Amino acid sequence: MTSDDTVRPGRPRSIETLAELTPEQTDAVLALLTEAARTDGQHAVSEQGRLQLRGPAREGVVHLLLTLDGGELVGYAQLEGTDPVEPPAAELVVHPSHRGQGHGRALGSALLAASGKRLRIWAHGGHSAARHLAQVLGLSLFRELRQLRRPLTGLDLPEPRLPEGVSVRTFVPGQDDAAWLAVNAAAFAHHPEQGSLTQRDLDDRKAEPWFDPAGFFLAERDGELIGFHWTKVHAEERLGEVYVLGIRPDTQGGGLGKALTTIGLRHLEGQGLPTAMLYVDADNKAAVAVYERLGFVTHETDLMYRTET
């Protein structure tokens, strides 16, 4: 969520709510997101949100386009209502050249209406204007997602020690899809944003330029997948990411998570990348402690706000 909500008079606007975007609309939204990211230093819409711009309509996902008279796109919001328990989640952005004209508040109000006034909304990077907009909309802080980083140069981690009977290999597209989706769902049953990924979501990621199965590590015991560490390389930023790390719940507690983390970090170091990053919920004290022991420190924080329940 990125918007300067200090209201100044502007041109008439309209907001259109769509289940599916045309290719031209998708291109316009992506251009808007790129311009906003260039100004703000981070994306206002997550990777999943950007992937959901493309292709046929997705169940539970709607797009809100804010245009001025003449059709100029200056604001975008996405609402996803696929979580069976929590309110719908949203992200929004206003073009940097059109902030301070109430467009963010207009999009926020439209999101509240579309969600039946049950809403969660992200403020990536904790942008001050986004925090103010959340307050104006009557939302309360609900979640803190930390981005942690550590240098990879001079990486000094002990040799990974795998639990007895466990071996590690890399992901084979097509062959391992179903098994990975099942373990991912089990490992993140408490985290629907990750645990609800479908074959289509996986295919979307496999089609991205950054996808590299050589950095997607699978841990097996007796031929069964029990854990994984999927790494990602952000080539332009020369940044490696602990993209997703999951352990099947019935096999947790044996040190596999730490071993897989080490294997992935060593792989990223081998790519010549200077820095590694990952995301972790601030209230996941155990995971935060593990990553801090591995040398990670907080780089920035994404904030989620929601309506009072």
UniProtKB/Swiss-Prot annotation:
Keywords: Acyltransferase, Repeat, Transferase. The keyword Transferase applies. It is an enzyme of class 2 (transferase). Acetyl-CoA 2 binds at L245, G246, I247, Q252, G253, G254, G255, L256, G257, K258. Its EC number is 2.3.1.189. Residues 16-158, 166-309 form the N-acetyltransferase domain. The keyword Acyltransferase applies. It catalyses: 1D-myo-inositol 2-(L-cysteinylamino)-2-deoxy-alpha-D-glucopyranoside + acetyl-CoA = mycothiol + CoA + H(+). One of its GO terms (molecular function) is protein-N-terminal-alanine acetyltransferase activity. NCBIfam families: mycothiol_MshD. HAMAP family: MshD (MF_01698). Catalyzes the transfer of acetyl from acetyl-CoA to desacetylmycothiol (Cys-GlcN-Ins) to form mycothiol. This is Mycothiol acetyltransferase. It comes from Streptomyces coelicolor (strain ATCC BAA-471 / A3(2) / M145). The lineage of its organism: Bacteria, Bacillati, Actinomycetota, Actinomycetes, Kitasatosporales.
